[in-house]
Amino acid sequence: MKISQFGSLAFAPIVLLQLFIVQAQLLTDSNAQDLNTALGQKVQYTFLDTGNSNDQLLHLPSTTSSSIITGSLAAANFTGSSSSSSIPKVTSSVITSINYQSSNSTVVTQFTPLPSSSRNETKSSQTTNTISSSTSTGGVGSVKPCLYFVLMLETIAYLFS
C-alpha cells in the first residue's frame, strides 16, 4: 500500500515541470498570448463604417494591439433599420484562422451591404459586436500538446510502476 502511494507521488514532478514549460512558452511567445486572447474568450470589438466603402475596421483590444489578424472571418450579416430609433446589429462572427504579420491594431473585413434602395440599409457610423470563438485556453501549438504529453508520461509511468 505504501509503495503504490509513493509511486503515485512520482507523477507530481513531471506535471509541475510540464506546467512550468507551458507557462514559459506563453510568457515568451507573444503570438501565443495573442492567440490566447483572441481564441480563448469573448471580446467586444467595434466596427467602423467608412461611409461609401464596404470595408469595416475591426479594432482589436489593447491586449492584441501588437499584431494584425489577416485570416478569414466567418460571414456576418449586417442588419438594422436606418431610422434613428433602431440600433443596427451585427451577428456574431467566428474567427476561423489567424495569421500575425505586422504591428497594427486594426484589421479590414468585408460585409455584403444591403441594396441602397432598401429601407433597411444601415446608416450607423459605429456598432459593436461580440465575436465568440474557440474555447482554447492557450496559444495554438503550445498548451494542448504539452497537456497530452503530460498525460502520456503519466500513463507510461503508471503502466511500468
UniProtKB/Swiss-Prot annotation:
Induction: Induced in response to cell wall damage. It comes from Saccharomyces cerevisiae (strain ATCC 204508 / S288c) (Baker's yeast). It comes from the Eukaryota. The GPI-anchor is attached to the protein in the endoplasmic reticulum and serves to target the protein to the cell surface. There, the glucosamine-inositol phospholipid moiety is cleaved off and the GPI-modified mannoprotein is covalently attached via its lipidless GPI glycan remnant to the 1,6-beta-glucan of the outer cell wall layer. Residues 1-24 form the signal peptide. GO terms for biological process: negative regulation of filamentous growth. Residues 140-161 form a propeptide. Residues 123-137 have a biased composition (Low complexity). This is Cell wall protein YLR042C. A lipid is attached at G139 (GPI-anchor amidated glycine). The keyword Cell membrane does not apply. Glycans are attached at N77, N104, N120.
